[in-house]
Amino acid sequence: MKHRQWLIAVLVVFSLVVSACAAPAAPTDSGAGSDGGAAAPAGEMTFVGTPRNETLILDNLNGSLERPENFNPYTPGVEMGRGYHEICLDNLWDVDTVTGEQFPALAAEMPTPLNDDYTSFEIKLREGIYWDDGVEFTSDDVIFTLQTWMDTEALAIHGWAVDYIASFEAVDKYTVQFNTTRPQPRMAKDLGVTIWDNRFYPMAKHIWENQDPTTYEYFPPVCIGQYKFSKTDPNGNWTLWELRDDWERTSVGQITEKSGPKYILWNFVGTEEKRILAMIANDVDILQDITPESMEVLTQRSDVVRAWHAGFPYADFDDPCERGISFNNSEFPYDQWQVRWALALATDIKNVSLGTFAGMLRVSPLGVPPVAAVQKVYHKPLVERLQAMTLPDGYAPFDSSFVLDMAKIFQEQGVGGDLPATDAELIDLFGVGWWKYDTEQAAKLLEDVGFTRNADGKWLLPDGTPWSISINAPSDFEVQSGRLAYAVADSWSKFGIDASVKPMTANTFWTEQATGQFEAGSYWPGCAIGADIYPNLSGWHQKFIVPTGEPAPGNVNRHASDEIAAIMDELEKVTSNDPRNVELSSDLLMQMALEMHWIPMFGTSKFVPVNETYFTNYPTADNYYEGPWWWWSNFKFIVANIQPKQ
């Protein structure tokens, strides 16, 4: 706590100095409180030459880009989150983040099953949708995209497509018949958005038909959303988008009859300290991911900044993806369950929580996030099975004391008065429990598969060479995962492993995950938004495994399991509301936990503040028309509701 307070004090002093010297691109005194009272300053210009009060500025979540001119959504490592998939691309079906239900976007309605076994569907397209170059979006674009998937083996999506799709045809200009290789009752979830985005990015046939889809950069991109590409920084730090004159001819225009600000700028200003200072100086309207310490600085230095919650705990705890450590499970030694379990048991999860986000995290032993809706259906009901679960040697690894231990730690730090009073409420806050911190059992598991220790207590591989682990981590983006990597490396180092962290830019980080060219990584492959978890976990099927070095259509961890595959094959056949769905999904999660297919650790706590100097009506906990998912595909619908300060 003392270190935290010291850091805040330093940042506050630093912010006073920098804001006093701030460039005139944006005012440091907004003249308005968080209630949106006074009008925004007029006449100010941004550094890209647009009126500040007409330009919504977002922090670029994934930092500086290595290939800023690559807009091909089907290439490994492409940066989707700089406005590209949020407001330029669009989807057949998107998701309402309040209800978790899908709705038709580019499609005119949800798909219609044409038979009782869910192998044939009719897809009706919304009429009057146009690409920003004036060409109408029709079934020709859908057919062209699907055919490109099927014909191009070098695309990562190809493996999934040939397994899933039997045939397709254009019935007319706005109707497609889509046939699957086997029953697919969740077809809209398989091709549409359930969380962040989807598989299906329509390709404009008139642009792509003479291009190689594996190498074409699609620059400048032709957009189907309500914004069009304006310009991008060749150094990869910013991208500017401009509202289309014909925004009514988009899904957002037709559905909401609204558009959004005239300009939207995604800008990466650098380190977290610089990002915080930019918001204090009113040079950024939306920050996408900061630390608890930085949130405290903002609340102290600005009266026009607020987070999801106006006060403590500020963050939204229900991001539908969880954080932890992934491995390439096809490569030695991570292909052995004993090694993965040893690393889990050698992780001091309480210290990792404190070192990552000051303990403000909800723990998860299962392969789906502990968001309220998911924890209610899976984490809480499965506690008894977790307690009864044993490894092959009879060892019971589950520890339900995490909640009380964390409460005690906070009480010792003098902040226990802010905690809930009951055990049930503490579980809602901190989670149901995790695995024991048991280095003796971890050592036993390693020794069982030939690992040894040298005289200094350092672990050696079975061939006698030193064991080192390099953990891929986001550099200057996705701060929770970046911090988690260092905290985990610290635990493993104390256990005698030469563990280190390898910070990476977004392009390299995601490319190495897709191609399996990593041994360990602070990734987040466990996502779900409700009881129907199969659509978000189906990619773990072993049929999607490809050799290391090739982009994977799914199962980037390359985890092979006949048991998991068998449960998934059954899950694929049932509908979302079938009672067997939760039963089979529970079995799937328990099997994944037993195999330790990756090491899930925490739900994601998102500190995503907004600045109300120039714009208002952001979604918040008390204005809950959408979640604070600025980096999701449905941001195009959120931004249509964000209003300029009048």
Q: What is each model feature region?
A:
Residues 124, 158-209, 226-228, 233, ...:
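Surface-exposed binding/hinge segments that line
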Residues 126, 215, 247-300, 341, ...:
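Ligand-site clamp/hinge motif
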Residues 78, 86-89, 94-101, 194-265, ...:
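Gly/Pro-rich hinge or "lid" segments in bacterial periplasmic/extracellular proteins
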Residues 149, 156, 167-168, 230-242, ...:
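Extracellular/periplasmic solute-recognition and catalytic clefts
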